[in-house]
Amino acid sequence: MAKKSLIQRERKRQKLEQKYHLIRRSSKKKIRSKVYPLSLSEKTKMREKLQSLPRNSAPTRLHRRCFLTGRPRANYRDFGLSGHILREMVYACLLPGATRSSW
C-alpha cells in the first residue's frame, strides 16, 4: 500500500491539471498556430504565461496509480489496477472475462 500522503499529492496534481487544462491548451495552440502566426514578442509572452502556471498543473507530472493500493508502477490502463492485484483478482475470478493463460 502506498503512503497516503503520496496518494493525496497525486490527487492534488490531478485537480490542478483539470483546473489549468484549458489555459495551458489554448496558450500552446496560440504558440503553435500557423494560421495566425504570432510575433516573437507575443510568443515570448505566451511562454511566460505558461511558465507562470503551477508546475504541478502540467499533465506530464501525473502518474497512474492502482485505485486499490495506490501503487504507481505496473498499472494496466484497462483495469486501473497494478499487476499483482490484477493477478490476484483474476485468480479469484473477480474480473469477468479474464482467464489464466494455459497452453
UniProtKB/Swiss-Prot annotation:
Coarse class of the protein's main subcellular location: plastid
Assigned keywords, A-Z: Chloroplast, Plastid, Ribonucleoprotein, Ribosomal protein, RNA-binding, rRNA-binding
Protein name from the UniProt record: Small ribosomal subunit protein uS14c
Domain of life of the source: Eukaryota
Family the UniProt entry places it in: Belongs to the universal ribosomal protein uS14 family.
Source taxonomy: Eukaryota, Viridiplantae, Streptophyta, Embryophyta, Tracheophyta
Any GO MF annotation of the entry: structural constituent of ribosome
This protein's GO CC annotations: chloroplast; plastid; small ribosomal subunit
Single GO BP term: translation
Function per UniProt: Binds 16S rRNA, required for the assembly of 30S particles.
Oligomeric form and interacting partners: Part of the 30S ribosomal subunit.
